[in-house]
């Protein structure tokens, strides 16, 4: 995914007894596996896909046990999808979780918050913030990223930080149904023709 040599995501947790070379380290990002899944679907002639995964990343922490933050990753390609399709999915998810007031900032290929930023097209990706806290990154994958995975069409991906999202989520409060159901009434108002509707609405409210 075009990570620079000094990327913190290259600092991995090594497994003592791996099943094979491909599984010898713990993943530090969900994005590579999502790209592999999209590549597999593309090579099997699936015209379009829209996928997601929830899982943990494993980040080294000195001599201690690694951190295991929960993440969510999305991936999609197909003629019906574009940058705004991915943005719409994220907006719907945030709305469902009760996260209001999220802000979107352009990402220029580098990011202090997400090591995966080089994987995205520098002019077609954005970071998601809530109250100044970065909760996600999404956009169109860089042509070199697509070439590395053998994906011959434009593809889009997103990564979201679940702990930060849940911290920003508004807890919903449920109330019992009213004992007496509401009723709807139609009102007929007699007035002069020169009275604006806005004045009537203001008087009613």
Q: Where are each of the predicted segments found?
A:
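Extended beta-strand-rich architecture
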Residues: 1-205
């Amino acid at each position: 995914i075009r990570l620079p040599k000094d990327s913190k995501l290259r600092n991995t947790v090594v497994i003592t007894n791996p099943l094979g070379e491909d599984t010898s380290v713990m993943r530090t990002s969900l994005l590579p596996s999502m790209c592999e899944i999209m590549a597999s679907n593309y090579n099997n002639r699936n015209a379009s896909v829209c996928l997601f995964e929830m899982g943990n990343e494993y980040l080294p922490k000195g001599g201690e046990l690694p951190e295991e933050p929960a993440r969510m990753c999305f991936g999609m390609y197909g003629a019906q999808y574009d940058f705004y399709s991915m943005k719409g999915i994220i907006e719907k998810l945030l709305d469902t979780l009760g996260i209001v007031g999220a802000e979107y900032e352009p990402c220029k290929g580098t990011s202090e918050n997400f090591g995966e930023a080089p994987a995205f097209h520098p002019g077609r990706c954005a970071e998601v913030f809530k109250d100044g806290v970065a909760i996600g990154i999404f956009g169109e994958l860089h042509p070199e990223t697509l070439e590395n995975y053998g994906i011959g069409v434009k593809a889009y991906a997103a990564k979201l930080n679940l702990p930060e999202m849940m911290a920003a989520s508004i807890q919903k409060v449920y109330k019992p149904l009213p004992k007496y159901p509401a009723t709807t009434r139609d009102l007929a108002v007699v007035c002069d023709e020169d009275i604006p509707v806005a004045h009537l609405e203001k008087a009613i409210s």
